[in-house]
Amino acid sequence: MYKDRKSIDLLNKIKEENFLLFRSVAAYLNEFPCLINKEIMEEIVGGVSENEEFSFALFLATALSENDDEAKLFEREYFKKSVKKLSADEYRENPYFKNIVIPRKKVSTWELGYQSYQPYEGFIYDDIEVMENYREIPKIGFFSEVFSFPTVFEDGVEWMAIKPNEIETMKPHVEKMSGDVCVFGLGIGYFAYMVNEKTDVNSVTIVERDSSVINLFEKYILPQFKNKDKITIVKSDAFEFAKKEMPKKRFDCAFVDLWHDVSDGVDLYIRMKKLESNSPSTKFYYWIEKSILSNIRWHIFEGILKRIESGNFSEPFENVKKYLSDDYLKNFVKFI
């Protein structure tokens, strides 16, 4: 009998609650993101705007749950810490929004344009927050007004957009960039622009394999950059560049953004982590790393559970917590 069984069972319970919550949130965002609208919000808050976050969280918990116990769990353990009313004006003051004009243009299968969030439409605005007990909090935001944002479409499908999620998830990485920077993945140049604006950044090398994306950027966006001379674009596969060219360059920092979400990000993340040793002087940073590590964490935990059930695991629970920590996983994936 595993001696720390109660602790393991509690962690497994939290994992299952995380999964239940995230399935419900995914269904909401994919199918009914405008479940709450201006009329509903006015009705439930009674005109008191200070109550909007609380009311949004409570309404969401009730709507996404199947019973009272679930509603209480969702509201108390997740949405109370998760839901945030965002300021549209604050995002409009973002340097990229203020200084870069995205024209409505179509080149081949690619198109530059705009999309909008409607008042009280829900969306993920930042990476997850992982609590000490490994409860994972999704960051759900909303605006009280229409908010438009630039978007790149491929064959009519959103490929990249400068939404609050991109801004917030990239913000801590932008702050850490200095010296000579390598950026894997171009998008529509948001990260490159924000880093390029920093006085402590000497150069920005962007690695992008899609020539159409590069052409769009060079024709319509790069000319609007103030310090264009700091930008170098390399058309290359990211992993080939990291393996063969990057070690020669001695970059100070690298930011990796090669995926759309966790579903296609885990394998790419692991591939790049294994190449870090080729450039030991470079500090690597990864987009939505917390969410990617969450996916890996629970796969590791499932393996530990199986070993416990078969009697092949006797390490204390403190070791389990260590194996599931971000710091441990960041190093562990290099050897998978």
Which residues does each predicted region cover?
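N-terminal auxiliary segments of SAM/dcSAM-dependent transferases
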Residues: 1-143
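Conserved class I S-adenosyl-L-methionine
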Residues: 178-189
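C-terminal substrate-binding/active-site "lid" region of AdoMet-derived donor-dependent transferases
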Residues: 260-336
